[in-house]
Amino acid sequence: MTPFWWAHSRFLNDNIVNSQITSIRRFTDRIPFSKLTDIAPAQVKCLRGDAYAMKSNEVVFGWVVNSDSDVAGEKVTVSSIKNGKYKLMIFHTWRGVFLEEKEVTVTNGTISFGPPYMRITGSQANYIGQDLAFILEPMI
């Protein structure tokens, strides 16, 4: 469900692909891939749909999707990570923007959070949609 379509069809063109790759790039720009150490899958689950995450000493990042409906009102739980304070950043995959950044605390190796259902920006309400990406960055 990420915006990038992994299938080729006559409806796929440069305008669609370039826009979608740009959205993904805005997310990955925040992850220092070349500096990550001790990279491993993180345990992550959600009430409905699917979730996947990676952890390292520097950052935890993941993706949550519900292709049957949406991720609004979803509860995401990430486990097997280090205790402490983190900056949680929730990313809108279709618009290519971070919707929310807030400080959270990991206790007993676990953090749970929910995506915003609607985000009001100026005079517009932005629906979260069928998927989201997230980053948990340790606060030092």
Segments from the language model and where they lie:
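Residue-level detector of conserved, well-ordered beta-strand and adjacent loop positions
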Residues: G114
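Short beta-strand edge segments in extracellular beta-sheet folds
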Residues: T105-T107
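Short strand-edge motifs at loop-to-beta-strand transitions and within beta-strands
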Residues: G109-I111
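Aromatic- and carboxylate-lined catalytic core of secreted/periplasmic carbohydrate-active enzymes
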Residues: M1-K102, I120-I140
